[in-house]
Structures are given as C-alpha cells and as structure tokens.
Amino acid sequence: MATWMEGKYVARGQFTGECIAVLTSGGDAQGMNAAVRAVVRMGIYCGCRVFFIREGYQGLVDGGQNIQEASWADVSGILQLGGTKIGSARCMDFRERYGRLKAAENLVKNQITNLVVIGGDGSLTGANLFRAEWSSLLEELVTSNKISAESAKQFHRLNIVGLVGSIDNDFCGTDMTIGADSALHRIIEATDAISTTAHSHQRCFILEVMGRHCGYLALVASMACEADWVFIPEMPPTDDWREKLCHKLRMNREHGQRVNIIMVAEGAIDRACKPITCEIVKNLIVSELQLDTRITVLGHVQRGGSPSAFDRILGSRMGAEAVLALMDADRDPNLPSCVISLDGNQAVRVPLVKCVDRTRQVAEAMKACDFDHAVELRGTSFMNNLATYIKLSKIEQPRQSVMSSENNLRIGIVNVGAPACGINAVIRGFTRLGITKGYKVIGIHEGFSGLVKGDASEIQWADVRGWVGMGGSMLGTRRDTPNGLGIDKVAAKFKELKLSGLLIIGGFEAYECMIELVEGREKYPELCIPMAMVPATISNNVPGTDFSLGCDTALNEITSVLDKIKQSALGTKRRVFVVETMGGYCGYLATMSALAGGADAAYIFEEPFTIDDLREDVVHLRAKIDDNVKRGLVLRADMLINTITSEFIHQLYAQEGQGIFDCRCNVLGHMQQGDRPSPFDRSLGTKFASKAIDWLDEQINANIVQILQSIHQTFMLYINWYCTSSDNLFKYSLELREHTDFVHRLPKEEWWLSLRPLMRIMAKHDSLYESESIMAGTDRK
C-alpha cells in the first residue's frame, strides 16, 4: 500500500495576522485558477490576509491597483475556467534590478512578505533571484528613502513558494506541472478529430505541438493516439531517420492502414542540433511516398479550454500546501524557499534553488547535445514514458510465416467486470508486443463465461488497429468468476487452449478471479501458469494500486457534467443540486469529483454520517446562498446507508431550504464510464501492457520446461501495479488479501481520504486539515 508521511494539523484561524500575495506569471496554463482559488481560501481559512497581484511580475513592479486584497467570493466560480483570473504577463522590467527594486518597495508598502508564484521555469528562476537579492534591495530602498529603516527591519525576510504552472511539463523536481494534463486533452481531442478526416482521404497528418525544448507533450500524445512517429528534442533521430520513417509509413500502408499521424515537438532537432520542422517532414513524405500530407499547428489551442479534473485537483492541492509551506517558513528562518511538487501521488516540498539549478542543467545538456544526460535530468517519469515509446516504436508487423508458426506459445487475455476506458489500450499494446516476442495472443471473449463456452480466438496484428482511443471493452466482459462457473471447467479450457500465460484486465471481480485461480492450483495443474492483472475500473477500488484504468476518464466525465449542472443554476439562481455518482461502496469518484467540481459536500460510505450532519450541511448552504452565492452542489456515492438515498437527501434539502433555495436531484448513471479514454488512461494502459508482457515473458522463459510438461508448480502470482512516477511495481495477490475488505469490495487503506478535509475547506466548512507535503530532493523526479 502507499505510504504517506504525516504532516501537521492546521485549524481555522491558526495563522491570524499574516499576509500572503499570489501572482501568476509567464505563459498561462489551465489549472492556474484552481491554484489561485486554493491559495486564497486556504489563506483565509488560516486567518491570513490574501492579496492578488494582477498581471504577474509586471503588476508587482507597477504596484497600485495591481495589488488588491482578495475575498472568499472573489474566487467563486473560477475553478472550471481556463487561463488565470488575475492575469499574467512576461515582464522585462523584472529582469533588471531596477524592476525588482520597485517590486520590493511595493511589497513592503503593502506589508507582504509571503509570496506564492505560479508559473514556469522562467518565473520561478526570477522568484529565486528576487529572494536572494531581498536584503540588498531593502538596503538600497532605505538609502534612497523609499522605505524606512524600521520597515526594512520588520520585513527583513521574504518567503517564496513556487507552484509550477506550465503546459510544457519541463520543470525539474515535479512529475507533473499544472496545465500539462489539460494540454494533453486538447492535443488528443484535436488528433481524434483529425483522424476521422484523415481516414476518409487516406491522408498523412503532421501535428506540431508546443513544449519549447521539452518533448513531454509530443511523447505522451504520440502514445495516446497511436502515432506512427514522434520527433522530440530529447531523442533526436539517427542520421538515417528519413529512410526509416519512409519505410515505416510504407509498411503501415501496405498492411491496410489508411491514416498516418506524425507528432513534431516545436523544439525537435536532429543529432547535429539542427531543427526538424513540419515542412521538412512533409516535403520528405510527399517526395518519397507521394502521400497526401497536411500540416496542422495546434498552437495556443493547447493552452485553452477548461482544465481537466487532474489539473483542478492538482492546482487545489498545491495551492493549499503552498500556504502552509509559507507559514512554516515564516516561523523557521532556516527553511529554504521551496516548490510544491508532485512525487508519484504525494505532494512534496523541493528546495527552489535545487529545482532551478537542475532545470538549468537540462538546458545546458541540450545545448551541448548531451541528450542522454538531458533525459536523465528530466526524471524517472519522463524516462519511463520514453522507454515505453521506444519499445513500441521498434516493433513492426512480423512476417505471416512467423505469426502462424505452430511453435508459438500462447498467452490468453481476458476482461472481467464492468467496462472501463483504457482497457483497449492494454489489449492493443499487449497483443502487438506479444506477437513481436513470438507469442500467439488468444483473446477470450465475454470474460470467463466466454472461456467456458469456448469463445476464444487468436488476435491478429491488424485486429487491434485504432483501439487505443476506443472506450469500453472490444473483447467483451462479464462479471462471472471461475468458482461461480466451475473452476474445473475453467481449468479444462486452459488445457484445451494450451495457455502458457494469462493477463486479466478488470476491477474487483478480476482481483477475486486471480485469488480463485491461485487457490485452484493445488487441485488443477493447468492453472500453474504465470498470470498478471491490470486494474481497470472506474470505481478505483482495487487493492494495491492508487489508480485503476478508467477512473481518470470517469472523473473527467463527471466533472464536465457538474460544470453544466452548475451553469444551469446561474439562470435559475438559488438552487442546490444533489448528484449521485457511481463507485459502489468506494467514494473515490464522489470525493475527487467534488474537489474538481467545487462541491459543498460529498457523502460516502467510508466516512459515516448522520441526519444531524446533513442538517448542518443544509444550514451551511442556507448561509452560503443568503450571502449572495447563487448555487450549491452536493454529491452522493451510489452505495450508502440504505435509508439515506439520493432522493431522501433531495427531499431533506428541499424541505429545510424552503424560502432560501430549491433543490434538484440528478443520477448520472452509466455515462460516467465515458466515451473515449482520457490521455492519462490511454498512456497508462499502454505502459501497463508493456510491463505485463515483459513480466509474463520473463516468467515463461524461466520456467519453459515446466510449462511445456504441465508440471504442477505454483508460480509467483502478481496482481497489479502501485502507480508511481518512479516505477510500476508488482504486488502479490495473496499478500493483498489482508488489506482487503471483501464484504464491501474495498481496500482497507485509501490514499484519497486525506483530501476530504481540503474539499470541505474549499467549500467554506470548518474542517481540520492535515498537511500532506514533506521536504524532498530533486532526485525524486
């Protein structure tokens, strides 16, 4: 299970009298508004005065009306908006000392010594320099009679915390920057749309994506849309790339592919550090292959639109932690300025100086054409993505004679449980990598019930073309388990199909199937083959993993609907919505969508509540709407106490809110499973497939004799991966049983429960918040 460091509890009004300012600088990024909102509301919750600095560093230099005190209501209704409410600008004045001198004067005059800077590497580098010069700036201001000596003494220390807001994801020290996930959404939305017209005309499309000198967006987008080729700065192609590119496109066309997609990062270069542009690639393809080729430059579309659920939650978490980091620094002068970063799934504080220095080293390595070192400096998350892409880019459809050889070992793949977006990405990646390794991949249709009926067939290379972007399960899925169907029948089919390994994709039912198959090995030797499982369920209730495939897509679907529901209340005003989400007994979807959607409450099984709690929330909403807030939003997970249904909550709110607000109820239902997978689910599914086939191949090769002779042997059985940035780790299924609540189909420990107080605080409730961040080094990325 995930291990979390304990932080400090923070109560309302704990830091009364402190002043905090927040600014957004440089290029805007979706999710900045979520961070600004969290800084303001957590600051006010802690008793601080919070100030907006409008127009970034330019507003800090100009002062005056650009520095304004913020209220709770000032950040209401901005969570779902792209860009930044307080404006951003690239400020040349701040690059010079005279500009920083004016900025220091304006901060002192407003009695501000705590600053949250939200921006990219340039903005945070400027913040680092500003803090380093603070003492000398104050001395100069005293000498020129701009401030008094008493003021200089009173405000002698400047505390700065950075939040990385950048779609490029190019800042060292954090796995994800605010805005990168939303930018991926825009890229994939555009690519999916382009693919349909490209298919009609058999065209090749070359897409230029942003990212400056970082290839993250192009790299992940290429995996998420089955691109034929990608050009990124960190991995310049070999000198013969023209021949290889043309060969790959030619082969794909010969095998029936009607569409070719090529991703080009705007900073793409060759081994001689010369730019590779879309025009160069287009001219090559047209001259050598005579393909109808078009260029699409996505441009600032990637910065726009509503933030993804991930960026809203990330911005909220980082903004809240930034306030607490500032308060800690104010009480301990030895603490360095830090950046609130994401390490795997945990917020950490990384020294700002080290982050800036490491980011500078990346630029130097790229300039020196030391690409391997640049990739290493980018961090483990980037390296894992790159390794997966390289593995997939090297494979091509084998000759038919190799694919049809009778000597090929057979690996089965089956789906169990409800459909979830991302499943098809696993099947595609697993199938093609398996075929390349010499296996026959046997697709078992309609779960284990299909297996018992003999509904299984070999999956061919071309069968899975285009599957990464498809929702649901193309193989079909059922909830039946081996014991329910008769494990003797399942074992007989294993023997009949001559399976040497098995991959199960699914949710809690798949987890139960794995355990039943392990327990059946003692009686049925046919089950003694390596098996692995990929967690895939929107409920995110599989023990041993932080994220299951499909839950990110579901979160985005729910968040999008919540935005529309809240929008409807703007016209009617004074309305509270009760919304029921899926998830079974697991409250993940209800809690995280409440945080991403700005809900006032979320009722879940894991956190018991009573009628009195409901009444308190009604009182809270009455006061909120009396205070000129137009709407309220309450979420409920679908499996709670039987008597407290969504309709009961709706009637209670409607009755208690009479004269103040009216109430409506919405049950979202199966639309939460989504249409097309999110970029996260597509890329995660592809990486899961790569890890699964590698492990199964290793186990099969290590035990090849025993498998062929059907010797009774219990191989080590792994269940799934705890998804971190540093690696994808396997877990033993039987070890996980003690961490499982089988009655309610839940893990006994759930990491996201620690975020519930933050959700309540953002909605103006009293709640005891626990800081989740710890101090860490840049080597975590």
Curated annotation (Swiss-Prot):
Regulation: Allosterically activated by ADP, AMP, or fructose 2,6-bisphosphate, and allosterically inhibited by ATP or citrate.
Residues annotated as binding beta-D-fructose 2,6-bisphosphate: 479, 537-541, 575, 582-584, 638, 664, 670-673, 745
Protein's UniProt keywords contain Magnesium: yes
Entries under Pfam families matching the protein: PFK
E.C. numbers: 2.7.1.11
Membrane-traversing stretches: none
Record-level Gene Ontology MF annotations: 6-phosphofructokinase activity; AMP binding; ATP binding; fructose-6-phosphate binding; identical protein binding; metal ion binding; monosaccharide binding
Primary localisation category: cytoplasm
Start and end residues of each stretch annotated as Interdomain linker: 395-409
Family: Belongs to the phosphofructokinase type A (PFKA) family. ATP-dependent PFK group I subfamily. Eukaryotic two domain clade 'E' sub-subfamily.
Protein name: ATP-dependent 6-phosphofructokinase
The species this protein was found in: Schistosoma mansoni (Blood fluke)
Encoding gene per record: PFK
